[in-house]
Every structure is written in structure tokens, then in C-alpha cells.
């Protein structure tokens, strides 16, 4: 895209019918933002994410707008290339139930996301209804108030999502499209290592970051595929509702 598009504007357009393929850059963000605000009535979302990125453990993007550097000397590049395997525990939007919905978000925050993030792509499981997509694409922008240079919608694909105390696995299209495998970070006991009282982007409540470095995190489709091993990973459950949003 030639111009930056806010995630909120993108997702509102996606909800109105752009889900079939990549975004066209000629829609009107201001109109979409107005629609998003008018649509944000009573809703709630409680979701768990299997998340990993290219940053070192623990990802600095929760403390700073500049991701980890990669390389040496003058050749250092900063980026945060991430995968998020989402499972909705419970949620609703204007009577639309969201319980059990799974979807995927992958992308790159770039060198300094205070100046705009690079790209992201959202992919839904085929069973997600039009109404559920509309609900989620209205709610999710409140969680990630980021401006993207490009944001596209991926082709629907099945999502595998499993988690135990020691291991978490999320795969998009059987791993052909994307994959995240996490293992529990060793602590002083057999219990997970958890960071408490740290905000997860725009979500006002969470149960803590369960530290689980990745065995692999990969995005294998599109023009910018990537794969990393042994970098940052965690699980988190957050909660947000329309009552948390200032109008």
C-alpha cells in the first residue's frame, strides 16, 4: 500500500466484505473508522494466544517500541516477525457468540513501530461465520492500536491449537502455512515461569505471560515468509470488553 492504514480501519473494511482477498489501497480509512466506532456497542472477549516472534527472550516490544536487533555492527536490523495462534474462550458481540473461534495473525512490527508497523495478515478458520468475523474485526483493533503499512486477509485455513503445562502447539493449514511450537521455560519448580502485572498491548486485563521459548515459529506463505528457532514465545489469556473502551 502506498499509504499507511490503521489496523482499525483495515479490520472494519474486512468486516464489510473485503475478507475474500488482499486489501485494495483505495478505500477510505476515515469512513471505516467512523463505522468501527458506531459498531462498538456491548461486547466482550476472553482469548488465549499461543504467540512467538523473532525477538530474543523476553520480547522487548512490551517495554519499548523498538524490537530486538539482528546482525552485527552497522548491519543490525530491528524487527519483530510474529505469529499469534488465537483461541476465543468466551465472547460475544451484539448477541453473536464467539466461544471456541480460532484465527491467526502474523506479521512484522518493523524497526520502530511508533512510526508504523510493517505488515500483518489475519487468517480465519473456514468454520468462522460472517457474523463472527464481523464481530472479531471490530473488537481486535482495540487490542492492537497499531498503524500498519500493509494489512491483508489470508485464505481461510484449518487451525490446530493445543496446549499443556509443558508444551503448546499451533499450526495453520497443518503447518504448511504457519507453525508455532513452544516449550515451557525451566524454572525453580515444575510450574511455568509467569510475568505478572505487565500490560498486553491494549488489553486491560491478563492472567500473565507464561514464558515458553519457541522450538520453531514460522510463516510459510505470501511474499515475506520467515522461520526462527529458539526465540521468544509465550502464552497469554487476556480479557477486554466494550466497557473498557473510552468513547
Stretches found by the model and what they are:
Residues 1-2, 46:
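Short N-terminal micro-motifs specific to bacterial/archaeal maturation
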Residues 24-46:
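C-terminal segment of N-terminal export signals and the immediately downstream linker at the start
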Residues 41-247:
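Beta-strand-enriched cores of mature, soluble protein domains
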Amino acid at each position: 500500500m502506498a499509504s499507511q492504514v490503521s489496523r482499525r480501519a483495515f479490520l472494519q473494511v474486512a468486516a464489510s466484505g473485503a475478507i475474500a482477498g488482499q486489501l485494495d489501497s483505495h478505500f477510505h480509512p476515515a469512513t471505516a473508522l467512523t463505522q468501527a466506532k458506531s459498531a462498538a456497542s456491548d461486547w466482550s472477549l476472553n482469548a488465549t494466544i499461543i504467540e512467538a516472534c523473532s525477538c530474543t527472550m523476553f520480547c522487548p516490544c512490551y517495554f519499548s517500541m523498538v524490537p530486538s536487533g539482528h546482525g552485527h555492527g552497522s548491519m543490525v536490523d530491528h524487527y519483530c516477525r510474529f505469529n499469534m495462534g488465537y483461541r476465543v474462550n468466551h465472547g460475544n458481540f451484539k448477541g453473536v457468540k464467539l466461544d471456541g473461534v480460532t484465527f491467526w495473525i502474523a506479521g512484522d512490527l518493523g524497526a520502530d513501530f511508533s512510526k508504523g508497523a510493517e505488515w500483518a495478515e489475519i487468517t480465519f478458520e473456514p468454520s468462522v461465520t460472517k457474523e463472527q468475523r464481523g464481530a472479531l474485526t471490530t473488537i481486535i483493533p482495540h487490542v492492537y492500536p497499531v498503524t500498519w503499512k500493509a494489512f491483508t486477509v489470508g485464505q481461510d485455513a484449518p487451525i490446530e491449537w493445543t496446549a499443556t503445562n509443558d508444551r503448546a502447539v499451533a499450526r495453520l493449514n497443518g503447518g504448511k502455512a504457519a507453525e508455532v511450537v513452544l516449550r515451557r521455560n525451566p524454572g525453580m519448580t515444575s510450574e511455568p515461569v509467569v510475568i505478572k502485572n505487565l500490560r498486553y498491548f491494549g488489553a486491560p486485563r491478563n492472567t500473565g505471560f507464561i514464558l515458553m521459548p519457541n522450538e520453531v515459529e514460522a510463516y510459510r506463505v505470501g511474499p515475506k515468509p520467515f522461520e526462527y528457532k529458539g526465540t521468544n514465545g509465550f502464552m497469554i489469556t487476556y480479557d477486554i470488553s466494550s466497557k473498557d473502551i473510552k468513547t
